[in-house]
UniProtKB/Swiss-Prot annotation:
<keyword id="KW-0001">2Fe-2S</keyword>
<dbReference type="GO" id="GO:0051537">
    <property type="term" value="F:2 iron, 2 sulfur cluster binding"/>
</dbReference>
<keyword id="KW-0411">Iron-sulfur</keyword>
<keyword id="KW-0408">Iron</keyword>
<feature type="disulfide bond">
    <location>
        <begin position="126"/>
        <end position="147"/>
    </location>
</feature>
<feature type="binding site">
    <location>
        <position position="121"/>
    </location>
    <ligand>
        <name>[2Fe-2S] cluster</name>
    </ligand>
</feature>
<feature type="transmembrane region" description="Helical">
    <location>
        <begin position="21"/>
        <end position="41"/>
    </location>
</feature>
<dbReference type="InterPro" id="IPR036922">
    <property type="entry name" value="Rieske_2Fe-2S_sf"/>
</dbReference>
<keyword id="KW-1003">Cell membrane</keyword>
<keyword id="KW-0813">Transport</keyword>
<dbReference type="InterPro" id="IPR019546">
    <property type="entry name" value="TAT_signal_bac_arc"/>
</dbReference>
<protein>
    <recommendedName>
        <fullName>Ubiquinol-cytochrome c reductase iron-sulfur subunit</fullName>
        <ecNumber>7.1.1.8</ecNumber>
    </recommendedName>
</protein>
<comment type="subunit">
    <text>The main subunits of complex b-c1 are: cytochrome b, cytochrome c1 and the Rieske protein.</text>
</comment>
<comment type="function">
    <text>Component of the ubiquinol-cytochrome c reductase complex (complex III or cytochrome b-c1 complex), which is a respiratory chain that generates an electrochemical potential coupled to ATP synthesis.</text>
</comment>
<comment type="similarity">
    <text>Belongs to the Rieske iron-sulfur protein family.</text>
</comment>
<dbReference type="InterPro" id="IPR019470">
    <property type="entry name" value="Ubiq_cytC_Rdtase_Fe-S_su_TAT"/>
</dbReference>
<keyword id="KW-0479">Metal-binding</keyword>
Length: 183
């Protein structure tokens, strides 16, 4: 009797049952590994509450000239002030060379009448006063830090006291005439 030869594929070039099982098992194994690894990869994404804090949209249409509001961005207070023409003129008249942290008013604002900055004193992290009508505004008609006596002008620049830097300006953009996107 002649011995039959066993080949890996049939004469028409079709895959054999063995090849089908190998490919099928490999595919199922790859899907299983992907499903097992997915929770670990997904864990590295930021949480939904963190993403929600990434940016804040502020409607500034209700803020009267000379008034200010405080919003929260990334867990910090952000001061948004609708400055008067007098505040703008006084802030722009200051020689930057006379400041501890030299910065022009124009470099701190995108639109002259709107000042947006993080309301945390750069000395030890207190929240300066000056947002409300009855708050002390310091010697330069801006903000006053009650913790150690730092005085900021109407552009948020340090003018007197122990704070080393100006109040920081967060990244922001006007999406239209009355809406500011912070962050």
């Amino acid at each position: 009797m002649a011995e039959a030869e066993h080949t890996a594929s049939t004469p028409g070039g079709e895959s054999s049952r063995r090849d089908f099982l190998i490919y099928g098992t490999t595919a199922v194994g790859a899907v299983g590994v992907a499903l097992a690894v997915w929770p670990f990869i997904d864990f590295m994404n930021p949480a939904a509450d963190t993403l929600a804090l990434a940016s804040t949209e502020v409607d500034v249409s209700a803020i009267a000239e000379g008034q200010a509001i405080t919003v929260t961005w990334r867990g910090k207070p952000v001061f948004v002030r609708h400055r008067t023409q007098k505040e703008i003129v006084v802030a722009r008249a200051v020689d930057p060379a006379s400041l501890r942290d030299p910065q022009t008013d124009e470099a701190r604002v995108q639109q002259a009448q709107w000042l947006v900055m993080v309301g945390v004193c750069t000395h030890l992290g207190c929240i300066p006063l000056g947002q409300k009508a009855g708050d002390p505004k310091g010697d330069f008609d801006g903000w006053f830090c009650p913790c150690h006596g730092s005085h900021y002008d109407s552009a948020g620049r340090i003018r007197k006291g122990p704070a080393p830097l100006n109040l920081p300006v967060p990244p922001y953009a006007f999406t239209d005439d009355t809406t500011v996107l912070i962050g």
